[in-house]
Design a protein with these regions (language model features):
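Helix-turn-helix
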Residues: 1-19
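Amphipathic alpha-helical linker/stalk segments
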Residues: 16-56
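A short secondary-structure junction motif
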Residues: 23-27, 31, 67, 84, ...
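Amphipathic alpha-helical segments that line or abut small-molecule/effector binding pockets
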Residues: 43-66, 71-79, 122, 126, ...
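Amphipathic alpha-helical packing segments from all-alpha helical-bundle domains
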Residues: 51, 65-78, 82-112
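Secondary-structure edge/capping motif, primarily at the C-terminal ends of alpha-helices
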Residues: 64, 81, 139-143
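Hydrophobic/aromatic-rich alpha-helical bundle segments in the mid-to-C-terminal region
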Residues: 89, 97, 110-160
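C-terminal alpha-helix
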Residues: 106, 157-168
Length: 168
């Protein structure tokens, strides 16, 4: 039935990818973080607060763990990364190195405002983003709504603790 509306599997994938990207831009704007990469809008990265980044990441976690389309897209992309270099590059851009670089650039700008000595922006970004990915995987591993909510709450607390530790 889907092929009545789409040419092929790739067309379906591209439409889902565009949808996911569009929602990401909306969440970025709503949270007050840049909706593009640092290279496209470096000035916007210098005006992001810890609260804005924290809220954005909490929204991202909810989205990637609760939205059925996003969950299925992420799982499909995870499998497809092993089938072609193009899908591997997209997986990295969407779920691994892309978010890590984005967060590193934000934390680099935020670190400039801090008086205390902080780890490198790269080390901070790894510390900040790793629990996102780990807890997302844990959420994938259960069908129990209560367990999923406990995992989400752990992530929310982690974000608050991270900013308390480094940016308070």
């Amino acid at each position: 039935a889907l092929y009545k509306h789409y040419k092929n599997k790739r067309d379906i994938f591209n439409c889902i990818f565009e949808y996911v990207c569009r929602l990401d831009v909306e969440r970025s704007r709503k949270s007050g973080v840049p909706e593009q990469d640092y290279s496209d809008m470096p000035e916007a990265f210098s005006h992001v607060s810890a609260k804005s980044l924290g809220n954005y990441m909490k929204e991202q976690f909810r989205y990637w763990s609760e939205d059925e389309i996003a969950c299925n897209f992420r799982k499909m992309l995870t499998l497809e990364q092993y089938k072609s270099p193009e899908m591997s590059a997209l997986y990295q851009k969407v779920l691994v190195s892309g978010p890590l670089e984005y967060i590193e650039n934000l934390l680099c700008e935020m670190s400039k405002e801090q008086e205390k000595l902080l780890p490198s922006p790269h080390a901070l970004a790894i510390e900040f983003y790793s629990p996102f990915y780990l807890l997302l995987s844990m959420s994938d591993g259960t069908d129990c709504k209560e367990t999923k909510e406990e995992i989400a709450q752990r992530y929310m607390r982690y974000i608050d603790d991270f900013f308390q530790k480094y940016f308070s």
